Amino acid sequence: ECEPMLTSDYRLMLEAPEDIIKGAELARIATGAKRIIIGIEDNKKNAFELIQKKLNDLIKNKAIPEEPLREVFLLKTKYPQGAEKNLIFALLRRKVPSGGLPFDVGVVVQNVGTAKAIWEAVSFSKPLYEKALTVTGSGINNPKNLIVRIGTSFQKVVDFCGVLNDTASILVMGGPMMVIAQWSLDVPVIKGTSGILAWPAARPQTEHSCIRCGRCVGACPTGARQLAGRRTGAGESPAAA
């Protein structure tokens, strides 16, 4: 969870650290992994300390075995640190090949919500029918982190948070960096819904011609080049696709 404004995974770490660790242990057994590494950004130090304490307590109480190695690391807070390829490189210095998967470099990546769901599925036969998400933004009267049943309409979720205020004119699903604009509240929460955000309309920005300085490529963690937007703007949609 590296998107600004989204804090639902952070709340899960504070409220269900034991379930997360036990779920990670089950995932390790299922995949045959030789170690577990938990990465937490350094703006969540209380979650880091809590996870570390619970891990030590579980080992001490023999709730999980001492072996194999399990480590908890603090990572620099930056976007997109939580993206799986970036996370793998930050923790292990392994590069996932273009078009490849983490498994290609001997890694399986799960977020804390998935780890918790694995534990609940095995321990309580509970199917995945709910999702932790953040409802926030200046257009939301009472921002909250919620656990919502999949299929619940955005309208009901927003109403639970005190309905939209008068400034809300933009509604999106996800974090502010990788949003999906929504044109209606009559859409359901899905498995991938990490947040519902509402803002006032943004002031239009003046668009300037690209001088091809390359700074955007240098700043991009994946080295992506801005070709699709340029081709689309030139009416070359098939080439951009």
Residue ranges and their predicted role:
Residues 1-9, 139:
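Gly-rich Lys/Arg/Thr-decorated short loops/hinges at beta-loop-alpha junctions or inter-strand turns
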Residues 88-91, 162-212:
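Active-site gating/interface segments in enzymes
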Residues 28-40, 167-169, 227:
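Glycine-rich phosphate/pyrophosphate-binding loops
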Residues 34-154, 160-164:
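Hydrophobic alpha-helical positions that pack around
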Residues 2-4, 79-82, 178-180:
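Short gly/pro/ser/thr-enriched loop/turn and capping motifs at secondary-structure boundaries
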Residues 10-18, 42-47:
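Cofactor-cradling patches in redox/metallo enzymes
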Residues 192-208, 215-217, 221-241:
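Ferredoxin-type iron-sulfur electron-transfer modules in oxidoreductases and energy-metabolism complexes
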Residues 14-31:
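Histidine-anchored nucleotide/phosphate-binding helix
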